[in-house]
Amino acid sequence: MNNISKLTAVFAAACFFSASAASAQDIKVSRSGDTTIVKITNPKKYLILPVEETKDESHVLLSTGSPADTWMDVRLARQKTDYCVPFALGNGKTATVKILNISPDALALKNLTMSDTWSVENTDYYRPLYHHTPSYGWMNDANGMVYKDGEYHLYFQYNPYGSKWGNMHWGHAVSTDLMHWKELQPAIARDTMGHIFSGSSVVDKNNTAGYGNGAIIALYTSASDKNGQIQCMAYSTDNGRTFTKYEGNPVLRPFDGLKDFRDPKVFWYEPAKAWYMIVSADKEMRFYKSDDLKKWTYISGFGRGYGMQPCQYECPDFVQLPVNGDKNNMKYVMLMNVNPGCLFGGSATEYFVGDFDGKNFTCVDDPHVPKWLDYGKDHYATVCFSNTGDRVIALPWMSNWQYANVTPIKQYRGANALPRELSLYTKDGRYYVAANVAPEVKAIRKDTKTVDNISTNAGVDKKGLAAGYEGAFEIEFDVTPAADGTAGIEIYNDKGEKTLVYLDMKQMRAVMDRTESGLTDFGKLAEPHDIEKKADAARQSKGQKPMRIENAINYKNDFALGTWAPLSLCEGKTYHVDVFVDKCSVELFVDGGRIAMTNLVFPTKPYDSVKFYSEGGKSAFSQIKVYKLGM
């Protein structure tokens, strides 16, 4: 049994070992029609629920008689247990839990236990060493991120009842340095109005909403089949630890009954002395205005037909950046996350640069030409912290909706990429956003190795260069590639698994190829978006390959492939390359983030060696440094 299998087995068993056995008198299971009723006397803090990921969702309710009681969806174990999740039982002397869609002979009902504690000790081989992850459960979009009183608040889409998407809450973690995160209790929980989808948070410095100067106000989407997607508000007066939902929710409904209407981004627009909100409305972004964060008026729309097509817009952000560092020349940047729309399939982040006059946002470049914030396949739902002064700090979710639910992980699913600081530059008369790794990341460098300059027309192998680093390291260097050749590095282990990062001067591309990076077969289970399937069928009817396959390098499946970015975004003949490797990811930054590229990888043994290579001529590598990274 390899290390991955051992840890998976440990996790499956851990839920039973960590739970305190309950006597038959403590837990009684009965049936009333289609409902399983679990009556508990002397309840502990948690009922421990066994999960089997491939099964349909059961519906679980802590029944207190309150109108606020909310059903949660849990893939309860039928034949085997993949892992367990805790289900809070409240503070009463007894507890009643109701379950729908479960057979009386299901394994989960035979193995119900209770515990006053829940272990969050890591049991997953692929948990990153320096990227943010939830201790357990599912995480996707970062949302509601705000900086206040020395703390960065990271809220995120979170399912505490399984490692697949569902039961959307706002999870919560805080940090003083963007790297060391302390996990707190979920800040906003799914309720009877629906799932708590993405949104944003602001510091209400002038008490416009009436909850006190400095209250944190969250705007989010409540989503359900009954109510559709509606915008709601909650407020916090304890520095973002807990939120109270506004009694007048929802604060905004789509005026045309639109189904896909979500992810509100709120910002203060000083010239109008008012709050503005952008909501993703399927194929466009809609602007609204408010004086009190409660009553909103429609202003304008933006983006229909723009950028990569076909697509669906989600998770907007709207920030101001100085052009080439000149604070007297500011432009607005609209971040628009699209799913589908990625060059290589699935989800990605594009952006538009322009001007805003309090009513309309107008692009200054051709809006029909897509611009990508990151050219990897695992960079999505990128939004920025609010209230950070002159700094614009973005945080992407590090996955792709095509396969996010089937990655080879159990205890948790979902990690955030490294924080990036955004800047705006011009090249050839056009505006571009650079997304460079935030300087706070340098603080986790532990050891430094310096490698002598390399000049080669073949390869120089540095076997064991990152030995003992547990697959968590950074390598940076300057490279001058052969004029029409290829220069790069091969990051590998002794299992023959490797990720290639190289500059192809003939094609003028920066490339990351993970075709042979480790576990990749799960990519065959990838599920393209319906919009993507329709576009694929249209191309195939004309004898063309699907766009994502045509764009990718060495396509094997929707995970096993290479991604690329145009080197035309950079300047000069020498490039600065910075590569961050963690247990399940490789992130590339070229020339200060003019090119960023983020991809997941799942090597079965940590990468510990690096080969520098050149093809088609002699290339020069200099200023080579390798850093061990860790918390």
Question: Where are the regions that the model predicts?
Answer:
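Hydrophobic core segments of beta-strands in well-ordered, beta-rich domains
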Residues: 49, 97-98, 141-161, 183-187, ...
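Conserved Ser/Thr-centered positions that define the repeating blades of beta-propeller domains
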Residues: 65, 175, 236-237, 287-290
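Bacterial Sec-dependent N-terminal signal peptides
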Residues: 1-26
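A compositional/structural signature marking long, glycine- and acidic/polar-rich segments
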Residues: 269, 278-387
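Beta-rich accessory regions
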Residues: 26-50, 55-66, 89, 96-101, ...
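Beta-propeller domains
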Residues: 57-59, 63-65, 133, 149-150, ...
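Structural motif
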Residues: 59, 106-108, 167-169, 227-233, ...
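Surface loop/turn signatures of beta-propeller and other carbohydrate-active proteins
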Residues: 31, 68-87, 106-143, 162-165, ...
